[in-house]
Amino acid sequence: MTRGLTIALDGMGGDHGPETVIGGADIASVRHPDIRFLIYGDETKIRPFLEKHPRVLSVSEIIHTDVSVSMEDKPSQALRRGRKTSSMWLAIDAVKAGEAQAAVSAGNTGALMAMAKVILRMMPNVERPALAALWPTARGESVMLDLGATVGADGYQLVQFAAMGEAFARVVFNIEQPTVGLLNIGEEEVKGTEGVKLAAQMLREADLPIRFHGFVEGDDIAKGTVDVVVTDGYTGNIALKTAEGMVRLVVDYLRAAMRSSLLSRLGYLLAYGAFRALAKKLDPRASNGAVFLGLNGLVVKSHGGTDAIGFAAAIDVAVDVASADLLSKIVTDLDRLSGLTTSMAGRKQNSDIAESEAVLS
């Protein structure tokens, strides 16, 4: 239910700025007719696009600022230059102030994460944030995290990611007990880093309401073996970019094959419906929109190079998680981890020592 929801938009974020943001808001407003938008950015650049979309214009308010964060800015630069004045900062701050239930930005990922952490702060029992998104699979979709927020996560943090990802999956898939798997180089218990093995041990032994499947490998992501795939941001981001590259390669191969001869062109026309269905399945815009989990507020990251269709999908994600009160569900799940803090911290220290010794040996 979207009644009463207000979404804050970074009107200047991404490669295409207001054109994509306003176009996406227009598409989203059809799917969510009761939604309202607070759009932050340069009014002289935003209003011309807004006036082309009267439906969005009627449910939007522009909050002017001529300061924006570029895609090239380092997080430290963005914080220094855009603190309290940039369109990205103001959109996130609207969530903190309770003026909006979620913020959506297609801007610089590092800057967005840095600002979100400064403004919203981390939840209790969470050390690092995780970026979670929907991933198309042979069985439908799964949740994968972390996709780049925390480059190196230890065992304790991976367990936190598992709890947050499980709550996210319950909300977006509307299922009671999603299955959770840890991404690893093999299914055997002896394989993997000390952190991954420690996380698996914790998830097996802890009295948590999580259906832990065990380890999953890279090919299990596309198979949809589990509902939630948990990994660190370094591995997750590489997996994401690899998958995006493979999709582009497959599409290029198909286009080349369909144009290779007259017979191929005729075959394409005969199978046009099937190709359209395949293209829809492979379209990354449908899965656009990743949520920063672990913060005291909802921030959704849209792909910087997406178009209006993709940005609308990111708004859809914001609406879904805000409507389902995702934050309270995550807090409840994380409270169940608080009793494990002492024992996990001890094992975490042992894990850190073991990894250090492995590096030095």
From Swiss-Prot:
SUPFAM superfamilies: Isocitrate/Isopropylmalate dehydrogenase-like (SSF53659)
Gene Ontology MF terms in the entry: phosphate:acyl-[acyl carrier protein] acyltransferase activity
Record pathway: Lipid metabolism; phospholipid metabolism
GO cellular component: cytoplasm
Main location: cytoplasm
Gene3D superfamilies to which the protein is assigned, alphabetical: Isopropylmalate Dehydrogenase (3.40.718.10)
Cellular location(s): Cytoplasm
Keyword Secreted included in the entry's annotation: no
Keywords: Cytoplasm, Lipid biosynthesis, Lipid metabolism, Phospholipid biosynthesis, Phospholipid metabolism, Transferase
UniProt cross-references to InterPro entries, sorted A to Z: FA_synthesis, Phospholipid_synth_PlsX-like
GO BP terms in the entry: fatty acid biosynthetic process; phospholipid biosynthetic process
Highest taxon of the lineage: Bacteria
EC numbers for this chain: 2.3.1.274
Role, per record: Catalyzes the reversible formation of acyl-phosphate (acyl-PO(4)) from acyl-[acyl-carrier-protein] (acyl-ACP). This enzyme utilizes acyl-ACP as fatty acyl donor, but not acyl-CoA.
HAMAP family: PlsX
Protein family: Belongs to the PlsX family.
Assembly description: Homodimer. Probably interacts with PlsY.
Protein name per its UniProtKB record: Phosphate acyltransferase
